Amino acid sequence: MASREERTEALAKNLHIYVSEAHIFTSDAIVLASFCAPRHKDKCCDLGTGNGIIPLLWHRDFRPKEIVGVELSESAIELLNKTLKENNLEEYIKPVHCDLRALKGILPNEYYDIVSINPPYKKLGTGIVNEGEDYKNARHEFTCTLEWFS
């Protein structure tokens, strides 16, 4: 059962996702999951997965061979684990609690067919910085920038 801060949102008749005030998803995650459109044989990794919306949509819509979601926030990983358990998806989606900057050696190199990332939109020093680690890291480039991956 969801706590006061947590709630579930339906993704299909028999599929729901746990969200919280700090870990919600928007239409851009839905568009990104569809844009990537994995095939059944693909091995997929979503970096900065948050509450796991992209891996869940990949599983719901495409059923790729393997799905991994990497996330820094412990509270987001807890939501993802709760979602996986209550939807009986633990064998299909593997959550990895890790800082992207420390990922080398944790996941194999040149292994995944699809790697997605929906990075923060605000560069350091711009905009109003949200309070709280989860809000701050999800919306500002404190722990991840696009330049790190280029």
Regions found by a protein language model. Give the residues of each.
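A generic local structural motif
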Residues: A2-R4, Y18, K82, A102, ...
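SAM-dependent Rossmann-like transferase core, predominantly class I methyltransferases
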Residues: S3-K43, T49-D61
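General secondary-structure edge motif
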Residues: A12-H16, V96, V129
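Residues at secondary-structure transition points
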Residues: S27, T49, I67, E71, ...
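Short, contiguous clusters of charged residues that form electrostatic/catalytic patches at enzyme active sites
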Residues: S27-S34, E78, C98, C144-W148
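Conserved SAM/SAH cofactor-binding pocket of Class I
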Residues: F35-I117, K122-I128
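Mobile active-site "lid"/loop adjacent to the S-adenosyl-L-methionine
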Residues: P119-F149
